[in-house]
Structure formats: C-alpha cells, structure tokens
C-alpha cells in the first residue's frame, strides 16, 4: 500500500543544509495502522508530508499502490492525492464556515455533485459522532470536536490512506483516548490504512500494529509494537520504552535490592499474563521473588503485563529460575542501575 524506498529530504536553513529525512525505507500493508515515533526534530513531520508529496523528496521513491508519485504528472498527482487524507494537530478549519460547510467546501472544489456532497457529509458526521453539530461554527466546538470535524473532512474524500500528523498532541488525555478509539473504528469499519506520527508512545501502544522509531532523520528501529516494547535494541527506542515503563522507585532503594540479589524486568505477553510462572519459581527453585512494582498495558492486539522483581538466591538457582521464566514465555531482562 505505502512503500518508501530510501527517501531523503533536506532544507536550506540560513545558508546551511539541514537533512530532515535520511534514507528512510518503510513498507506499510493495506489496512494496517503504522506509527512513527520520535523526539522533536527527529524528522517525523517531514517524513509524513513526503508520503503525499506536500514535501517532495530529494531522493528515493514514494510508491502508493504500485505508483511512484514522483513520476506522475500534476493532474495524475492530484487524482492520487484524493486517495490520501490528512489530519493535523492544528485542525485547519475555516472559522467563518459551519461544520457542514467545512466538510462540504473541499468536495465542491473537487466537483462532487451536490446530492453526493450531502450524502457524504451526513455519513461522515455520523461516523465521527457530530450529527448535532452540523450548523455550529468552530468557535463553538471543543478541541476534540474540532479534530472530529477535521477527520470527517478528510474522510469525505473517501481516501484509502489517512495520514495523521500529531493529531492528538494538543488534546487532553480523555479526548485523546476518544480520538484514538475513533481512528480504530475508522480502520476497522472502513478498512482505511492509517500512517501516524507522534512523540507519545502511549498513542503507538494503544492503536498501532507496527512502529518505526526515528532520530535525527534516520529510522533507527522498526517492528511490531510488542517487539518494540519487549525487545528494543536501539538506545533511542530503549529511552522511549524505559520512560513509559518507569516505576519511579527511589535509586537508593533499588541499590539496596541489587546488593542482596538480582533485579529483573519481566514482561508477560497476552495469555502469559494470566499464567502463574512467577508464583511457581519459588516452589521449583531455591530463590525468593519479591514484586517491587507492576502494571498492565493494553495494546491494540492484546495485553502486556510488566513487573519489576527482586530475586534472592545463589547464582546457579537464579540462572535456573530465569531459564524457566523464559521457557514459560516471559520476556526477562536484568536491570542494571546507572
């Protein structure tokens, strides 16, 4: 559906060349929700704008449904872009137009027949839950409602792909969750492929199938959300995951536990979260486990339990216990203090 092949993009800033995106390659399957996460300045926004050629890459290829967008004529590109909707952090609504007209006007400019415009606007206002706001103006809406209008406007062109550029970053947590649930609904019911960028790992965790991590214009790691959370390899990815999974235990207390045993981070994936593997460790081996902290993350396709555990016992028994946990499907990582 979306193929990025060695895409690069640079800008001239005060006489200096700034490489915003450097040789990025990503493939997104039809119907997938794919996320790109990174800190500010990583190149995320530039990358997402390369997909519909709002930013034309200096090098590489952007291929949508087998078509290299860079080789299309202006007319062909306009047609191709109709299948790529986009939502932004800043809504970009017309202040003097009603909700209905904000959705309808782009369709009028596209030459869509009047009766078809009416049908589409009503359909997508219903999908985003704003049927009763059709005659309201943007100033009368909350931030979440404005974003819903922006989503309806993007959907009214009936795209196959929806690009999301930090669409939830200006919203409060409750509204963010509502928008994420709406995106999941759109993906499931309409079959639309979603490509989103964010600096919030929680957004990735809640709705994405796969994720790529960017730093300084480079793609440093990509994989399933589960793999990124449990088997992160790159330092930047580990910082993201580490900040998300932090239990905020005082350093002096952790040092006390390390002095008397081993500290391990355990991840229980899916059904393994319900298995008593840790409870059986003390029965099978001469080690004493103490749970210091824990929690459960709800991913798009399952659950991920996480525990910080102190294991007290000799080295041989400790090794046996760790092997048993791994064989039981638990992801185990020894915690090293700074």
UniProtKB/Swiss-Prot annotation:
GO cellular component term of the entry, any: plasma membrane
Domain of life, per lineage: Bacteria
The name this protein goes by in its record: Methionine import ATP-binding protein MetN 1
Subcellular location: Cell membrane
Membrane topology category: Peripheral membrane protein
Organism: Listeria monocytogenes serovar 1/2a (strain ATCC BAA-679 / EGD-e)
Molecular function, one GO term: ATP binding
Family, similarity comment: Belongs to the ABC transporter superfamily. Methionine importer (TC 3.A.1.24) family.
InterPro entries listed in its UniProt record: AAA+_ATPase, ABC_transporter-like_ATP-bd, ABC_transporter-like_CS, ACT-like_dom_sf, MetN_ABC, MetN_ABC_transporter-like, NIL_domain, P-loop_NTPase
Name of the encoding gene: metN1
UniProt xrefs under PROSITE patterns: ABC_TRANSPORTER_1 (PS00211), ABC_TRANSPORTER_2 (PS50893), METN (PS51264)
């Amino acid at each position: 559906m979306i193929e990025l092949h060695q895409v690069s993009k640079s800008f001239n800033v005060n006489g200096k060349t700034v490489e915003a995106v450097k040789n990025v390659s990503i493939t997104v399957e039809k119907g997938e929700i794919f996320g790109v996460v990174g800190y500010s300045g990583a190149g995320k926004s530039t990358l997402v704008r390369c997909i519909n050629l709002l930013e034309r890459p200096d090098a590489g290829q952007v291929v949508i449904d087998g078509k290299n967008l860079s080789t299309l004529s202006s007319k062909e590109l306009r047609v191709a872009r109709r299948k790529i909707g986009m939502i932004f952090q800043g809504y970009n609504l017309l202040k003097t137009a009603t909700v209905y007209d904000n959705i309808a006007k782009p369709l009028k400019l596209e030459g869509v027949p009047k009766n078809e415009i009416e049908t589409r606007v009503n359909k997508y206002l219903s999908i985003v839950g704003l049927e009763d706001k059709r005659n309201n103006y943007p100033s009368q809406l909350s931030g979440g409602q404005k974003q819903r209008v922006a989503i309806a406007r993007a959907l009214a062109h009936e795209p196959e792909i929806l690009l999301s550029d930090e669409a939830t970053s200006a919203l409060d947590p409750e509204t963010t969750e509502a928008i994420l649930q709406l995106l999941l609904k759109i993906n499931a019911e309409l079959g639309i492929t979603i490509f989103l960028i964010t600096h919030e790992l929680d957004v990735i965790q809640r709705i994405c199938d796969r994720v790529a991590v960017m730093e300084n214009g480079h793609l440093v790691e990509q994989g399933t959300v589960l793999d990124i959370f449990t088997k992160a390899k790159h330092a930047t990815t580990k910082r993201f995951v580490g900040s998300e999974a932090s239990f905020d235990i005082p350093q002096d207390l952790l040092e006390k536990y390390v002095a008397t045993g081993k500290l391990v981070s355990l991840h229980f994936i899916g059904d393994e979260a319900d298995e008593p593997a840790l409870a059986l460790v003390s029965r099978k081996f001469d080690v004493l486990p103490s749970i210091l902290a824990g929690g459960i993350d709800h991913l798009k396709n399952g659950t991920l339990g996480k525990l910080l555990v102190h294991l007290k016992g000799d080295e041989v028994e400790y090794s046996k216990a760790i092997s048993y946990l791994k064989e039981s499907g638990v992801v185990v990582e020894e915690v090293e203090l700074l």
